[in-house]
A protein has these predicted regions:
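Bacterial N-terminal signal peptides
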Residues: 9-17
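Sec/Tat signal peptide C-region and signal peptidase I cleavage site
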Residues: 18-23
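Bacterial N-terminal signal peptides that target proteins for export
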Residues: 1-8
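Short, surface-exposed binding/anchoring microloops in extracellular/periplasmic proteins
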Residues: 24-61
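Short, solvent-exposed, Trp/other aromatic-anchored flexible loops in extracytoplasmic proteins
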Residues: 72-102, 108-113
Length: 126
């Protein structure tokens, strides 16, 4: 599956083409990164997944370096979102070292693990 990507740098909004979630894969629909008022960056991530209940749902997403070697933060999702698709959750004040200009967001589900598709977003002011 190919996901079309367009990056709008002015608002640091990453929009990904809406495609139906493949069974088991979490689709990252949108990522917004903004400078936090208390330092670091705030992230809003919208996910689409065919949650079926407590044994199969999108259970977290994380912010890492583009090469995947540095971990910056994680948003744990504590319950399924069967009737709320896509859904958006936030992670605030993520500290990212100076010099890092963009990060990768990847999503996970309880049954299949990490989704193949990731999203890369530019950090505002970097």
């Amino acid at each position: 599956m190919r996901v079309k990507r367009a990056l709008i740098l002015a608002g640091t909004v990453l929009m990904l083409g809406q495609s139906a979630a493949i069974a088991g894969d979490v689709t990252i629909v949108e990522v917004k990164a903004t400078s936090s008022s208390v330092g670091g960056f705030d992230f809003e991530v919208s996910l689409l997944h065919d949650d079926t209940g407590w044994t199969h749902y999108a259970d977290r997403w994380e912010v890492v370096s583009v090469d995947g070697k540095q971990y910056f933060g994680e948003r744990v999702l504590f319950h399924p979102h069967v009737n709320e698709q896509p859904f958006t959750r936030s992670l605030r004040s993520v500290v990212i070292p100076e010099g890092v200009k963009e990060v990768m967001v990847r999503a996970h589900d309880k049954e299949h693990g990490w989704a193949k598709e990731t999203a890369t977003v530019a950090l505002p002011g970097r």
